[in-house]
A protein has these predicted regions:
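His-Asp phosphorelay/catalytic-motif detector in bacterial-type signaling
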Residues: 45, 72-77
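Two-component/phosphorelay signaling modules centered on CheY-like receiver
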Residues: 11-36
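Short acidic, S/G/P-rich loop/turn micro-motifs used as interaction or catalytic elements
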Residues: 11-14, 51-58, 84-87
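Short hydrophobic patches on amphipathic alpha-helices
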Residues: 41-42
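Alpha4 helix (beta4-alpha4-beta5 surface) of REC/receiver domains from two-component response regulators
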Residues: 58-62, 85-100
């Protein structure tokens, strides 16, 4: 059975990249959602959540906090993909218990 990996990406630019990278690995199913659809992601309790920070307009720390405070997703792994190299920004994101 495939593990659902939700990719939060408002312009859907990273979905094809992840699907191509894992095309030979049928264990993972990548599902793209927009930030306004976060409730769908939380309701389905995914195996992993990947957030493309460069494609969303929402504050990444508050989005991660929303995921972490959801009772069913407190331990769901979160990976943030970002081009932001600011050290303080990384620390702020890591404080929300995510991988950067």
């Amino acid at each position: 059975m495939a593990q659902d990996i939700y990719v939060i990406d408002d312009d859907e630019s990273s979905i094809p990249i992840f699907r191509e990278l894992f095309k030979n690995d049928k264990e993972f199913k990548f599902i793209g959602v927009r930030t306004e659809q976060i409730d769908i992601t939380l309701k389905n309790i995914p195996f992993l959540i990947i957030i493309n920070e460069d494609s969303i307009d929402r504050d990444i720390a508050s989005l991660c906090k929303q995921i972490r405070t959801d009772e069913d997703n407190q331990i769901t792994p979160i990976i943030v993909v970002s081009s932001n190299t600011d050290k303080y920004h990384k620390l702020e994101v890591l404080e929300q218990s995510v991988e950067y």
